[in-house]
Amino acid sequence: MKKVIFTLMMVALASASFAQENAETKLWTNKGTVGLNFSQSSFTNWAAGGQNALNWIGTLNYQANYAKNGFKWDNTLSTSLGYSYFNFKDKPIKTDDKIELTSLAGLKATEKLNYSLELAFRSQFANGFDYETDSTHRISKFLAPGYITLGLGVEWVPNKYFSMNFAPITGRVTIVNDSLLAEKGAYGVEAGYFNPNDSTDWISGKHARYEFGARLVAKLDVPIAENINFNSKLELFSNYLDHPLRIDVDWQNQLILKVNSWLNCSIATHLIYDYDVPFFEIDPATSLPSDTPIKGSKVQFKEVLSLGIMFNI
């Protein structure tokens, strides 16, 4: 499965690397950034107390877009990985981890509308833990979860700053490539259970969940002042087959202030709402997450403020 996912990621971007430029028209446009954001604190005989800490987040973003005779193919890779080290002896704490790949093929319908087919993949690089309860209790890893989405629809591009893709025919697969998490029903897959007709027969949890519905993705990338840029991505998904009014929400925002050609300051937020993703309460007897999941309307929210270096590639 890992080979399949990495193949999908590389096909979309490698094609652009070997594309030849037309003598009259540049068919491919490529741009990207690589960055490293960090902070550090150190205390020696500090009366008020404090913890030595080192925090870093690495990012890689790349776009490879093709356009010719009313046909376009837009490919975007967005990745980040970050850790915090306290006292430089304890196990590092993961603060950011993202792999997102989208590939959209569009055929011009009108001046501002395109027929579209979009493939999207989302997962993470490293293991994730519930650090508030037990730093050895793994709650995520590569492909646990992993999301693969394929949708057919229409894209509206009114200007160079905004686009919206609506795909009323969309299939989505949620992958949980971890047996322990699958048995608990993590990330909405069917949990393992005992056969009601035979209490000794354990039915294993599923490693994938399949959905069919509608997906809307709106993107905004606009300069709001000199050296200040704001970008936002809102993704909504409705599952036709199970409570279609329970809309999944994934909303990412980032404000970037460029100090100079390589130094920048940024603040990023990420909000997720998915009714089907269960949460596990803490068992007071063990101080560990309970084996009984709780489904419900919990909003996931993350905010990252960082200062660092960024270079164009």
Explain the meaning of each model-derived region.
Residues 299-313:
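Outer-membrane beta-barrel "beta-signal"
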Residues 32, 36-38, 58-66, 101-107, ...:
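Residues on the lipid-exposed face of transmembrane beta-strands in outer-membrane beta-barrel proteins
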Residues 45-50, 85-91, 134-140, 201-206, ...:
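Extracellular loop and loop/strand-boundary signature of outer-membrane beta-barrel proteins
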Residues 44-48, 87-91, 128-135, 176-183, ...:
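Outer-membrane beta-barrel translocator domains and adjoining extracellular loop/strand segments
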Residues 24-40, 71-73:
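Transmembrane beta-strand segments of Gram-negative outer membrane beta-barrel proteins
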Residues 1-25:
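Bacterial Sec-dependent N-terminal signal peptides
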Residues 36-42, 68-70, 79-85, 121-127, ...:
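Transmembrane beta-strands of outer-membrane beta-barrel pores
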Residues 71-73, 112-115, 161-164, 227-230, ...:
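Repeated loop/turn-to-beta-strand initiation elements of outer-membrane beta-barrel proteins
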